[in-house]
Amino acid sequence: MIYSSVILEEILRFANPSETVWVASKSKGNTKELALAFVMTPRFISKTQIINSKNIIDGWSWQDYTLDKLVRIYIICLISELDGADQLNLLFDTAEINEAVALHAALPALKNPTQFLLRATDAVRSNMGSVFESIAFENPYPSLYFSELAWNQMVLKCIFNDKAIHRIYGLENRANQALADTLSDFAHERWAAGRRVPSQVWRLVPKFMNENLQSDIKKLEQSDNPRDILAAQLVIKEIDQPGSTKEQWKELELPEPIYQV
């Protein structure tokens, strides 16, 4: 599917007359001209908040986007539709933080998204939080294209850095035994140090119970923390009634520093 036309419709809902003229003037350029427009976008486009946005790809949310970011994504899509992979790779190589955020956020809408799989997995290793979050959160690209190893690395990085894993699209669908076992090992390390893990991480284990994980859930049941007790109850319920706990896990989708005692 070609997404640029749908994105343009959304842009025109929020752009003022001068911004509309600027976007129209750049839309017919070649890949080099579009790349220049991508870099220049913040000079001509405001940071108007995008609200009540369309859902054109499952899991791809523009909820926190600004207009200049959406215009950049539109331009990226135009370059992709012109088979401008070389130009996009050049933009990746030279991007400052906000440009990199837009590039990674745009990946699900590109003409040949798998061409940029290495770029996406590199973003998981980025030390720039906003770049990491642009691929990890409200972005279906990892769920669609990451290997199990790359997926697990992304989820674990979120957990280790106390980031909100419920913002990862496809979290339950991509759960796997290796990830569940690693979470158990991580919990044992935290507990040995007198620390906790965020209670909602246990949503990833019901399909993969083994002796170690069963022991972990029993430990949660005996916790003094009501969030841990609720997590244990939800794991048990999910085992008995698969798919029944999705809404209830939302009660645990709150900031919960992993280093709290």
What residues fall within each predicted segment?
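N-terminal alpha-helical scaffold/docking segments in eukaryotic complex subunits
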Residues: M1-E81, M154-V261
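Eukaryote-skewed repeat-based solenoidal scaffolds used as protein-protein interaction platforms
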Residues: I76-R190, P206
